[in-house]
Every structure is written in structure tokens, then in C-alpha cells.
């Protein structure tokens, strides 16, 4: 997959005033997705009971909360999220905050 052409190759699974989410690569047990979070918006936040997750920030700036920790993020930052930790992303910039998510596949992902 040519990562620069992801939108032509990806499956758009969410599109609303807050963000767009694309599934880029789905393996038997692993997903790679892209979130484009609009300025001034935040994700709903969630946790995965036992699965770890990795976020790779590719554009924009903002903040991620992982449990009680608040971390400023920008392009090229990587954040590891341990299983069971609630996490939420905030776009504090004036442009779209884009990040890759790498996580274990789960039932109902595309709903």
C-alpha cells in the first residue's frame, strides 16, 4: 500500500463534524486506521480491556489523555497506550490533527 494514497485505498468508517476515520489495513488480528480530527474537537474516548494501542501523530498539534496523564502531541510523536487505560485526543490547533492508530482488531469496529 502506498501510504500517501491512503484515501483511495482505505475504507471510510466514520465521517461527521468531529472527525473522519479510515481503516487502512486490516489483518486477521490487527488494524491500522487513520483519524483526522477537526480543529477544536475531541474524540469520545475509550479503552480496550486488555489490548494495547499505539498512536502515531502525523500532522497538527493537540493533546492526548491516557488515564490521568495529559501529553502534548505534534507531528512525529508516538504514544503507547496500555490495555485498560482510558484515552482521548483533543485537537488544540487550527488545522486537522491526524494520527495513525495501531490496535488489535475487535468485533463491531466498522459500526
Task: Give names to the regions the model predicted.
Residues 18, 33-48:
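Conserved short histidine dyad/triad with adjacent acidic residue
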Residues 42-44, 63, 79, 83-89:
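Histidine-centered metal-chelating micro-motifs
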Residues 28-30, 38-41, 61-63, 105-108:
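Short, charged/polar surface micro-motifs in flexible loops or helix N-caps
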Residues 69-83:
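Short acidic-glycine-tyrosine-enriched beta hairpin
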Residues 36-38, 49-64:
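Short, conserved beta-strand element in jelly-roll/cupin
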Residues 83-109:
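Ligand-binding loop in jelly-roll beta-barrel domains
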Residues 28, 39, 50, 69, ...:
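A generic "binding-loop/recognition-motif" signal
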Amino acid at each position: 500500500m502506498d501510504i500517501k494514497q491512503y484515501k483511495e485505498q482505505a475504507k471510510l468508517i466514520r465521517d461527521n463534524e468531529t472527525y473522519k476515520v479510515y481503516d487502512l489495513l486490516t489483518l486477521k488480528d490487527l488494524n491500522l486506521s487513520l483519524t483526522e480530527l477537526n480543529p477544536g474537537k475531541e474524540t469520545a474516548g475509550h479503552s480496550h480491556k486488555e489490548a494495547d494501542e499505539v498512536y502515531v501523530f502525523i500532522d497538527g498539534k493537540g493533546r492526548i489523555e491516557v488515564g490521568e496523564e495529559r501529553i502534548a502531541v505534534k507531528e512525529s510523536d508516538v504514544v503507547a497506550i496500555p490495555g485498560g487505560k482510558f484515552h482521548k485526543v483533543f485537537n488544540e490547533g487550527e488545522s486537522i490533527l491526524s494520527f495513525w492508530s495501531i490496535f488489535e482488531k475487535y468485533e463491531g469496529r466498522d459500526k
